[in-house]
UniProtKB/Swiss-Prot annotation:
Keyword Ribosomal protein tagged: yes
Comp. bias regions, Basic residues: 29-48
Taxonomy of the source species: Bacteria, Thermotogati, Deinococcota, Deinococci, Thermales
TM ranges: none
InterPro entries referenced in this protein's UniProt entry, alphabetically: Ribosomal_bL34, Ribosomal_bL34_CS
UniProt family annotation: Belongs to the bacterial ribosomal protein bL34 family.
A GO cellular component entry from the record: ribosome
Any single biological process term in GO: translation
Protein known as: Large ribosomal subunit protein bL34
Alphabetized Pfam families for the sequence: Ribosomal_L34 (PF00468)
Sections of the chain in a coiled coil: none
Molecular functions (GO terms): structural constituent of ribosome
Subunit structure: Part of the 50S ribosomal subunit.
UniProt-annotated stretches for the region Disordered: 26-48
Length: 48
C-alpha cells in the first residue's frame, strides 16, 4: 500500500501556504488565532 505522505512543495504551499490562508475567511481566522497564540510560524515551512 502507498504511504500517505508523498512530499510535494507546491501542493503544500497551495493548501497550507500564507496566500492560501488569506484567500478564505476561515483561513484568515486561522492566521489570526495563530498570531494571538504567538506562534513563531503562521504557516508550515515550504522552502528550506
Amino acid at each position: 500500500m502507498k504511504r500517505t505522505w508523498q512530499p510535494n512543495r507546491r501542493k503544500r504551499a497551495k493548501t497550507h501556504g500564507f496566500r492560501a490562508r488569506m484567500r478564505t475567511p476561515g483561513g484568515r481566522k486561522v492566521l489570526k488565532r495563530r498570531r494571538q497564540k504567538g506562534r513563531w510560524r503562521l504557516t508550515p515551512r515550504v522552502h528550506r
